[in-house]
Amino acid sequence: GVPILDYESVLEAQVEVGLGPLHTQFGPDGYAYTSLFLDSAVARWSIGAEGYRPQDGWSLISKIPVQYNVGHIATAEGDTVSPDGNFLVSLNKWSVDRFMSTGPLLPQNFQLVDISQQGDNLQVLYDMPFTGGEPHYAQIIRADKLNAWDVYPEVGWNPLTQSVDPNA
């Protein structure tokens, strides 16, 4: 019962961004960002929506090298209808010879990229080793959008069911 759409009939554009494109996130200013596994880079490209695009639509604007072999990337609310923020985090799979040895497994690493400037102005701001296994998927949300509790609403609160639980 699920309709199968013809690929060519629903294709708006196809932007050649580089080798090994994997994941795409969006910024608040009309740019999209795609991780390039084989290029070890993140591509910035302009989307084509008239009145929204910052530069020529559907075109590669720039690439920023990351180390090494990026998989997932995350921008603030970058996979929603209203992306928000000035930063991208590149979740890189390899960090060969970049950080102190932590044992037989090499750490992966995250890189914080400033995406606040227009055009080809991208800058890596920070590198962080990460030893929690290969990084997969992340969400970034502005802190002022969270309504965090300082304490649970009631004694015996189960955070999984969001209710009082006699076994909690």
At which residue positions do the language-model features occur?
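Predominantly soluble domains enriched in secretory-pathway, periplasmic, or organellar proteins
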Residues: 1-168
